[in-house]
Amino acid sequence: MRNPWIAAWLVSVGSLAACGPETHAVPAKRPNTELIVGEYERHPPDGETAIRFRGDGSVRLAKTRALLDTEPPLASGAWKLDGARLTVTYDKGICTERAGDKAGVYTVVISKVGIHFTKVEDSCERRSAIDGQTWWRIK
């Protein structure tokens, strides 16, 4: 008589174990073209430069975050992102003296916390300083 009860108990315990904890799908990361939109800054000792990427594809660079809305900016222009490949093209300010310096290409890793730049191609020495740096999200 014990065997049927033990068998029933083992079946019920086994079915509970098979259910296990409920798994939840991890939400997908938003596309980089959405994540990049915002303001970022460097932290010392790398500097205090700030940059704003807008949803309309414009970019603005300033000496500090407090100067992002003042004229003239260090540089302004446009950005284009294809996957993790960012092209920044300045049409005013630094990196515009020579035609070949206007655009720089970087591989970026973007998160809620910030953006990390790795240079692919950029002949502008001043902009190239961002190679290997992480800029922290302001907002």
Please describe what each predicted stretch is.
Residues 19-78, 85-139:
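Lipid interaction determinants
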Residues 1-17:
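Sec-dependent bacterial lipoprotein signal peptides
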